[in-house]
C-alpha cells in the first residue's frame, strides 16, 4: 500500500476550525454534516493480507467499515461480529463484506491491530450552481492510551472541478495548512503502540545478506531471523488464533534444523549437536496438532470426493479428529509455555550472539563460497535421486526425494540475496512445481495410512460405524487414484527441472560464485 499524503495535511495548532470554515465560506457555500466521534479498532491478519491489497478494515462495536487506504473511499459498510479477540471471515453474515474478505484472508483470522479515537466533521463545498465541487474532512485522530493527538485536514476532489479544488488548496495554504501527512497516521501510530507496524511480518523468508560477511556471520543472521519468527508465532499457536501460526512456527523450526544439517563446520560441533536435538524435540512436540489441522482443513475436499449418499459417514470421523485436536492442542500449549521450551530458545539466542570459544573450520570463509558449495551439493543430490524414480518407486523413496528438494529450497532461500534475483526466482519456481507434486504425493500417502488405521480400529456393529466405514473406504479409493495420477505428473515436472536450461542456470549461478570466492 502506498503511503498517501498529497491531499491530507496537519492542521496548525493555532488554527481554529471555525476560522478555517469562515475562510472557505468566502468562496463557497458550505454544507456541514453533523460531527462524528467513535473509537474504532483496526483489524487485519497477522501477515497483513488486507493491507497488502490496499485495504484497511475497522470496526466500532458491530459496525464494520472496509475502505481503500490510499483514497479513503469506503468499499463496504456492514454489521459483523464483536471483535473481542480473533475472528474469521466466516463469522460475518452473508453479504459483500464477507465476500470481499474470504478470498483475501483465506484461513487466517482477523486480529485487533490498533485502537484509535476519531472525531470530526465533513463539509461539502458548493458553487453558485449548488454543485458539490469538493469535500473537506476535519478530523482528530488519537491512538489509544496517552498517545499524541493528530489534527488533520483532508481534501476530496470531485472530477471536473479542478479549478475549484486549486482554489481550495490556495485558501488552505493561506491559513497555514502546508505540511502534508499520511491520513493513516493514527492507524500507524496505533499499531506502533501495540508493538506492530504495517508489513512487519511475512511467512516468506527474506533476508539481505552482506556478500562480504563470513559464513559464521551470515548463518548467525539467518538463525536469528528464524528465531524471531519462532518467537512471534508462539503466542498465536498457544492461543490457537488460527492454524497458520502453528504452521509458520513449524516451518521456522524446520528451517533451523535444516540449516544445522546443511551448513556444516560453521558452528562448533557441540553447539550443532545440542540444538539439533533441541529443535528436533520442538518439531516432534508440535507435530501432532499440525497433522490434525491438515485433516480438518481438508474437510470440504474430503466430502466433495464422495457421493452425496456417503458424505454423512464422515461426520463422526471429523468429530473424533476435532476431539483429538483439542487434546493435542492442550498438550502443545503446555509444552510451549514450559520452562524447558523457553530455556531452549533463550540458550539458542545467547549462543548465536556470543563469540565461539573455538571457531569451527569454515566459520571464517566467505559466505558466497559456502553457499555455492551447499546449493550445488543439494542440487546434484536431487538430480541423482530423481532420476532413480519410476512408476514403481515405493512411497518412502518419493518422500526421501521430497525432503531433499525441501533442503535445496531452504538453502537457496537462505542465500538468495547473494545472487541475481530474477534468475534465482526462475529456479525456485521450477523447484516449487516439483515440490508441490512431491508434497501432494506424500500427503496422500500419509492420509491413506491414517484412514487405513482408522478403519482397522472401527468396530463393526452400529449403523453409524458401517456408514463411516463406507465413507472412509470411498475416500481412500479417491486419494489412491489421485496419488497414482501424480506419478506421471512428477515425471513431467522432473524432466523440466532437470533439462539443460535449468541445470545450466544452476551451474552458471552457483558454480561461478563458488569459483570466484
PLM feature segments, named:
Residues 1-517:
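Function-determining surface determinants
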Amino acid at each position: 500500500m502506498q503511503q498517501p499524503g498529497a491531499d491530507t495535511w496537519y492542521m496548525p495548532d493555532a488554527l481554529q476550525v471555525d476560522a478555517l470554515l469562515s475562510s472557505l465560506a468566502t468562496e463557497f457555500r458550505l454544507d456541514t454534516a453533523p460531527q462524528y466521534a467513535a473509537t474504532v479498532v483496526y483489524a487485519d491478519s497477522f501477515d497483513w493480507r488486507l493491507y497488502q491489497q490496499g485495504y484497511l478494515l475497522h470496526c466500532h462495536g458491530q459496525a464494520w467499515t472496509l475502505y481503500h487506504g490510499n483514497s479513503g473511499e469506503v468499499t463496504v459498510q456492514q454489521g459483523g461480529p464483536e471483535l473481542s479477540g480473533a475472528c474469521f471471515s466466516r463469522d460475518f453474515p452473508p453479504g459483500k463484506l464477507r465476500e470481499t474478505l474470504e478470498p483475501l484472508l483465506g484461513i487466517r483470522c482477523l486480529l485487533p491491530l490498533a485502537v484509535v479515537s476519531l472525531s470530526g466533521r465533513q463539509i461539502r463545498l458548493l458553487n453558485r450552481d449548488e454543485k458539490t465541487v469538493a469535500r473537506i474532512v476535519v478530523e482528530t485522530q488519537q491512538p489509544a492510551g496517552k498517545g499524541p493527538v493528530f489534527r488533520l485536514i483532508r481534501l476530496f476532489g470531485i472530477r471536473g472541478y479542478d479549478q475549484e479544488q486549486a482554489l481550495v488548496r490556495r485558501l488552505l495554504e493561506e491559513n497555514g495548512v502546508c505540511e502534508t501527512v499520511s491520513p493513516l497516521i493514527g492507524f500507524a501510530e496505533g499499531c506502533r503502540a501495540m508493538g506492530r507496524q504495517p508489513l512487519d511480518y511475512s511467512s516468506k523468508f527474506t533476508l539481505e545478506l552482506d556478500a562480504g560477511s563470513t559464513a559464521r556471520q551470515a548463518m548467525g543472521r539467518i538463525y536469528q531471523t528464524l528465531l524471531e519468527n519462532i518467537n512471534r508465532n508462539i503466542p498465536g499457536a498457544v492461543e490457537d488464533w488460527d492454524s497458520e501460526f502453528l504452521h509458520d512456527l513449524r516451518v521456522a523450526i524446520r528451517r533451523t534444523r535444516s540449516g544445522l544439517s546443511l551448513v556444516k563446520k560453521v558452528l562448533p560441533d557441540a553447539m550443532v549437536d545440542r540444538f539439533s536435538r533441541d529443535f528436533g524435540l520442538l518439531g516432534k512436540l508440535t507435530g501432532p496438532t499440525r497433522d490434525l489441522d491438515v485433516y480438518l482443513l481438508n474437510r470440504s475436499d474430503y466430502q466433495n470426493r464422495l457421493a452425496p449418499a456417503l458424505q454423512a459417514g464422515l461426520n463422526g470421523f471429523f468429530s473424533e479428529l476435532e476431539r483429538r485436536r483439542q487434546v493435542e492442542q492442550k498438550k502443545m500449549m503446555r509444552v510451549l509455555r514450559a520452562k524447558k521450551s523457553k530455556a531452549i530458545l533463550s540458550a539458542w539466542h545467547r549462543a548465536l550472539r556470543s563469540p565461539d570459544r573455538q571457531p569451527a573450520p569454515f566459520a571464517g570463509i566467505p559466505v558466497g563460497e559456502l553457499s555455492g558449495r551447499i546449493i550445488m551439493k543439494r542440487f546434484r543430490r536431487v538430480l541423482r535421486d530423481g532420476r532413480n524414480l519410476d512408476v514403481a518407486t515405493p512411497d518412502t523413496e518419493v518422500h526421501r526425494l521430497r525432503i531433499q528438494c525441501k533442503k535445496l529450497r531452504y538453502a537457496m532461500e537462505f542465500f538468495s540475496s547473494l545472487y541475481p534475483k530474477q534468475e534465482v526466482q526462475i529456479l525456485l519456481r521450477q523447484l516449487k512445481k516439483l515440490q508441490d507434486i512431491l508434497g501432494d504425493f506424500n500427503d496422500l500417502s500419509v492420509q491413506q495410512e491414517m484412514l487405513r488405521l482408522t478403519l482397522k480400529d472401527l468396530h463393526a456393529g452400529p449403523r453409524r460405524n458401517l456408514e463411516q466405514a463406507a465413507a472412509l473406504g470411498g475416500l481412500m479409493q479417491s486419494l489412491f487414484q489421485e496419488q497414482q495420477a501424480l506419478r506421471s505428473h512428477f515425471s513431467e515436472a522432473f524432466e523440466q527441472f532437470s533439462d539443460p536450461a535449468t541445470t545450466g542456470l544452476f551451474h552458471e549461478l552457483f558454480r561461478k560464485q563458488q569459483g570466484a570466492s
